[in-house]
Amino acid sequence: MKWDEPPLWPVAVPSLAGFAAACIPYVFPNTPQLVGGELTTPFILLMIMSPLLYFSPEPTGGRAELILGANIGMFFAFLPQAIFFVWFIIVILLWLAQSMYVWRRNYPAFRIGTWIGLGAVSGLFIGGLFGHLILV
């Protein structure tokens, strides 16, 4: 998939969804925690919401590949955080770098999905910091 101009939805929608999911436990304090960790429940919510990519605009390519790529991108971006504390910085910088040039080249739907997954988890990390530092 190659766009003629920078697209807004693959950058804004996943990162805003991750940001909102990370802020939910802070806005609604009685939110049930499915498993331990502040961001694990919002991450599971993002995984549950990933099939909504099926309704993405047509030019993105294969819908199943897009969803699979987003899920793998989210796992790649989220799971190392348990071991490597500053992993979120790497994920956010990688997503920003990808956002600058991924739209200029012709990539398959799976690669676009990994970019979307990185954006969702970047929003999750930024929303977690925002919730912990501002909303508490």
What are these regions (language model features)?
Residues 1-80:
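Membrane-associated alpha-helix detector
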Residues 13-20, 90-93, 123:
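Lipid-exposed faces of alpha-helical membrane segments in multi-pass integral membrane proteins
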Residues 78-115:
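Membrane-helix boundary connector in multi-pass membrane proteins
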Residues 124-136:
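Juxtamembrane boundary at the C-terminal end of a transmembrane helix
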Residues 27-28, 88, 136:
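Membrane-helix interface motif
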Residues 115-122:
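The cytoplasmic-loop to transmembrane-helix boundary for the fourth helix
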